[in-house]
């Protein structure tokens, strides 16, 4: 394998990270369903529930501007109601009446406005609440700044409207402040604003928390908190409420106290609730820590097993050879033992077992291969070599592991074997789909050699049948005709012509008349048309032109391919069915004249196709077949362009003496021996167009 290195996946693209996030969100939804039985809690502000977005994208949203408008309108109504209640009591009213009117108006107004605008903007209606939410990162800084601006603007607008509609004699108590509060020092008033604002903001956080299980309505809780705090020396509790009357009446005495006290108290309340009293964050941190511990323990266990697997082959490599699982450096044993002790201590395991692993006394597990007891033992692969768990690293794959299960679409090794040079040796023909029974053909050949003809008139026909059967053995079932029918090697033509001349000289007294057309002299004498090299087995036959003299040979019937003449040609021959089996009839329109005095020329031998060489020896010869059986399995002989009509006539009535029969039998045996020798020479000269079989 070219590359066996392990690649780690980043945390953002790891499936474990997404699974943990999914479980966290499901837990939040479950807690929302359990604690959300009230309508106000289910309609929390989108500022607390919306996902984090960039400030530029947040400004472009409609929800952002709707929230700002709702905060401005709520602050306007709150300042107008609270300051109007204090001013309505009158200038000479008692302190208790002013305090009661202001506290009730503040609590009821805040409860009503919270119920109206909680699902839109969160119903802050107080810069201290907005700043506390910004500190704990519940809202963005740009939203907090816009909220505070809208709240201050709404407060100024409410105070201005109230100042305009108030009777001139009742404008003195417009600030809704008790007269004795002026006797207190600045730091005393700062402490009162800090403590009371801390309580109000804490009540807001608890009431609007969707994870908190409580009894009652969030709007009522917030209103009660404002009312209770207003009964204590009537503080402002809201910088926007102090800014509006001060701006309209132009009274700025110790105005910084009413800004810094509520803002600092609100920020302190938000931080305390977020990091101390917020159950959601505590559960989230606890779950995240437990998940990290579990994953770290799983990682440590897998790394421990992996390091042990990497270490053990390194020990046995020194004495028993290499190990196919992986490689490690020289310090792998010490590091694995040290890491194993540390990780085992974190997981609560026995460090002694892991420490002994570096010394060889380790515990066998399912994923490791047992050590080799001797050099004769074969190396065994682990029972399961895949990924052991969701969090562990896969072991280094080897070629042996890949050979276990190969896919259907596995890459073949044809490209590898393509460049391999075949081994030297004898050429072995490829095995055909249909088996070529060479042994049976050899047995038939031996039987035909031992067969003796009963009558002299059929001796030449029997020799022709032997040639046809020999031609059948030399042809393959996938054989095709060559591109030039009349081309053969000169040596084979000369040998076959000599054979035919000897046959004609040895049978001068037989009553057989043969007539054969001579081929054109240009085909026999032209050396360019004769093949000079190897003739391809799968050649394509070229169609002759109409002006060519060979076009008459292309009009043969399909029956003439097998050397059998049709019914229309049988009338021209006086032979029987058996004798006409081996006769060849040309495709000429007019039969040639018969001249017994002219010495016939030997016919061209049939073209030999590709075939495996027959074995010389046969164990069991088959029984002799008759002429009718040989007629059924008609041999296929490809006729040459120079072939012409040949007819044989036998004189069955002529008396033959026993001496002539013996001479003919001797001649036939000599001819058969010569034919066998010539066939062996031809087979040695044949070329095969097959490559040797490649080794697997």
From Swiss-Prot:
Q: What is the effect of changing residue 71 to D?
A: Partial loss of transport activity and increased sensitivity to blocking by the magnesium ion
Segments in the Extracellular topological domain: 94-97, 168-189, 235-256
Q: Which positions carry Phosphotyrosine?
A: 273, 367, 384, 478, 610
Q: Could you tell me which residue ranges are on the Cytoplasmic side of the membrane?
A: 1-71, 119-143, 209-213, 274-696
- Which terms in the GO cellular component ontology are assigned? membrane; plasma membrane
Where is composition skewed (Basic and acidic residues) in this entry? 549-558
Molecular function per GO: channel activity; monoatomic cation channel activity; water channel activity
Q: What is this protein called?
A: Neurogenic protein big brain
Similarity comment: family membership: Belongs to the MIP/aquaporin (TC 1.A.8) family.
Q: Which organism is it from?
A: Drosophila melanogaster (Fruit fly)
Q: Which InterPro entries match?
A: Aquaporin-like, Aquaporin_transptr, MIP, MIP_CS
Alphabetical keyword list: Developmental protein, Differentiation, Ion channel, Ion transport, Membrane, Neurogenesis, Phosphoprotein, Repeat, Transmembrane, Transmembrane helix, Transport
Domain of life, per UniProt, equals: Eukaryota
Q: What SUPFAM superfamilies does its record include? A: Aquaporin-like
Task: Give the sites modified to Phosphothreonine.
Answer: 47
What exactly does this protein do? Essential for proper differentiation of ectoderm. Acts synergistically with neurogenic locus proteins Notch and Delta during the separation of neural and epidermal cell lineages in response to the lateral inhibition signal. Voltage-insensitive monovalent cation channel. Ion transport is blocked by the presence of divalent cations.
**Parts of the chain that traverse the membrane:** 72-93, 98-118, 144-167, 190-208, 214-234, 257-273
Q: Which GO terms describe its biological process?
A: cell differentiation; cell-cell adhesion; mesoderm development; nervous system development; transmembrane transport; water transport
Question: What post-translational events are described?
Answer: Phosphorylated at its C-terminus.
């Amino acid at each position: 394998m070219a590359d066996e290195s392990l690649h780690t996946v980043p945390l953002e693209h790891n499936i474990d990270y997404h699974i943990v996030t999914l479980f966290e969100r499901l837990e939040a939804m479950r807690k929302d369903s359990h604690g959300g039985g009230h309508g106000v809690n289910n309609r929390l502000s989108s500022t607390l529930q919306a996902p984090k977005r960039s400030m530029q994208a947040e400004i472009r949203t409609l929800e952002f501007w709707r929230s700002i408008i709702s905060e401005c309108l709520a602050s306007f109504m709150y300042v107008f109601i609270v300051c109007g209640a204090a001013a309505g009591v009158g200038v000479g009213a008692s302190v208790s009446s002013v305090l009661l009117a202001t506290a009730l108006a503040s609590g009821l107004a805040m409860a009503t406005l919270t119920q109206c605008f909680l699902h839109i903007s969160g119903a802050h209606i107080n810069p201290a609440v907005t700043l506390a939410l910004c500190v704990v990162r519940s809202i963005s800084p740009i939203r907090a700044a816009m909220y505070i601006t809208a709240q201050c603007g709404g407060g100024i607008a409410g105070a201005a409207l109230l100042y305009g509609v108030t009777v001139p004699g009742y404008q003195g108590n417009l600030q809704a402040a008790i007269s004795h509060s002026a006797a207190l020092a600045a730091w005393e008033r700062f402490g009162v604003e800090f403590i009371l604002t801390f309580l109000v903001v804490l009540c807001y956080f608890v009431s609007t928390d969707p994870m908190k299980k409580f009894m009652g309505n969030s709007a009522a809780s917030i209103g009660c908190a404002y009312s209770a705090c207003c009964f204590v020396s009537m503080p402002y509790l809201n910088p926007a409420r102090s800014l509006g009357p001060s701006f309209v009446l132009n009274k700025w005495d110790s105005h910084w106290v009413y800004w810094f006290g509520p803002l600092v108290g609100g920020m302190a309340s938000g931080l305390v609730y977020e990091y101390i009293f917020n159950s959601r964050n505590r559960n989230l941190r606890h779950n995240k820590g437990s998940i990290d511990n579990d994953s770290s323990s799983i990682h440590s266990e897998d790394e421990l097993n992996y390091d042990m697997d990497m270490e053990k082959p390194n020990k046995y490599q020194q004495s028993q050879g290499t190990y196919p699982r992986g490689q490690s450096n020289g310090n792998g044993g010490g590091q694995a033992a040290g890491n194993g002790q540390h990780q085992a201590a974190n997981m609560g395991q026995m460090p002694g077992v892991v420490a002994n692993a570096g010394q060889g006394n380790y515990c066998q597990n399912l994923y490791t291969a047992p050590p080799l007891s001797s050099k004769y033992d074969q190396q065994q692969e682990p029972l399961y070599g895949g990924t052991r768990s969701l969090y562990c690293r896969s072991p280094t794959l080897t070629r042996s592991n890949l050979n276990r299960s190969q896919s259907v679409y596995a890459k073949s090794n044809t490209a590898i074997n393509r460049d391999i040079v075949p081994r030297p040796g004898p050429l072995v023909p490829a095995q055909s789909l249909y088996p070529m029974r060479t042994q049976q053909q050899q047995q038939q050949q031996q039987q035909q050699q031992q067969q003796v003809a009963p009558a002299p008139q059929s001796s030449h026909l029997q020799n022709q049948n032997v040639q046809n059967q020999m031609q059948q053995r030399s042809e393959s079932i996938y054989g095709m005709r060559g591109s030039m029918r009349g081309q053969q090697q000169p040596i084979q033509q000369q040998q076959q012509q000599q054979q035919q001349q000897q046959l004609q000289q040895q049978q001068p007294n037989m009553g057989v008349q043969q007539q054969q057309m001579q081929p054109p002299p240009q085909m026999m004498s032209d050396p360019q048309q004769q093949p000079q090299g190897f003739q391809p087995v799968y050649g394509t036959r070229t169609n002759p032109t109409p002006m060519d003299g060979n076009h008459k040979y292309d009009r043969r019937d399909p029956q003439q391919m097998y050397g059998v003449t049709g019914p229309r040609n049988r009338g021209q021959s006086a032979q029987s069915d058996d004798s006409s089996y081996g006769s060849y009839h040309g495709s000429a329109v007019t039969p040639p004249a018969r001249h017994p005095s002219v010495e016939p020329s030997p016919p061209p031998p049939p073209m030999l196709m590709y075939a495996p060489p027959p074995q010389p020896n046969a164990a069991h010869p088959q029984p002799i077949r008759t002429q009718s059986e040989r007629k059924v399995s008609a041999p296929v002989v490809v006729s040459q362009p120079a072939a012409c009509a040949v007819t044989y006539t036998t004189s069955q009535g002529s008396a033959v003496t026993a001496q002539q029969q013996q001479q003919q039998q001797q001649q036939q045996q000599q001819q058969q021996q010569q034919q066998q020798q010539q066939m062996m020479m031809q087979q040695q000269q044949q070329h095969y167009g097959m490559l040797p079989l490649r080794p697997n």
